[in-house]
Amino acid sequence: MGSEMCIRDRNFRDAIAAKYEHFSGIKVDPESEIVVTCGSTEAMMATMLSITNPKDKVVIFSPFYENYGADTILSGAEPIYVPLVPPDFTFSIEQLENAFKQGAKALILCNPSNPCGKVFTFEELTAIADVVKKYDAYVVTDEVYEHIVYAPNKHIYMQALDGMRERTIVCNSLSKTYSITGWRLGYVIANPEIIDRVKKVHDFLTVGAAAPLMEAATVGLKFDDKYYDELAAHYAHMKEVFVGGLEKLGLKYTDPQGAYYVLVDVSEFGVKDDVKFCEWLAQYVGVAAVPGSSFFREDVHNLIRFHFAKQDDTLNEAINRLAGLRKAVAEAGDVEWR
């Protein structure tokens, strides 16, 4: 009885549908077009298991959130990587189409992107949609950062594009928008045929999300536009503090258009091994970063990722410590990362 309550919590799904329609303009049926999952991690895994067969191929833009490759492989499919080329993280339509010529069944699109902060333009999304329609495939979207977008950029919903209503499978989460990462509340929005499969997979993966947390989160889903405006302004402030600090230090970075990550180019320091460099950075400079190579399929070792969703005091202290980076590098001598 409790499991059935979790699966069929109509209040939560009604609230998801209403919010999604408000921002995307798309009306969805809470009963037949939404499945509630234990976070977007399960949403993506359940989706991949629902739409792929063993040896199917799935297109993934690189750099990418590491789960995408793992989810594809765990579902028995094979990833095909298409590069987003720094510093603007543009992609080649020819390379994208070549990936689909290999028989790709779907493309995973993280928009805004983790780790590079790219927000795909209308023209880019339309180009992707045209290729997907041409090869009769799906787009699986990860839109967890939909409300963390920096002006003048705008988040555009793939499902709202012409001909993409039935071809788009939306994976989303409440974690980032409402700062409730530990609650593990996510959802899938798709056409009824896909949702019917996702429901079955979801039942065997986790059975259901926590009913009390769904009831509590329903309140958040009903917040008015003022909340989302304030959220965007709050993240824009954090970006200004940290990325503005990087600018003052003269460090080379790619300006994030959305999400709360920034990739910094450390090639000026002669970095050959970004993993070793990040270990050294934490130990000798006192600032933590993630090696960029963990997100790229390509041989990229000159980028590191910083996360700036922190209090001002923490961000300012990080910038103060990074101010000593060049001096620390000069005094480092013979280090493993060079």
Placement of each model-derived feature along the sequence:
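Long amphipathic alpha-helix in the N-terminal Rossmann-like dinucleotide-binding domain
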Residues: R8-D14
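PLP-dependent class I/II
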Residues: M1, E21-R338
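Short, small-residue-biased leader/transition segments that mark boundaries at the very start
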Residues: M1-I7
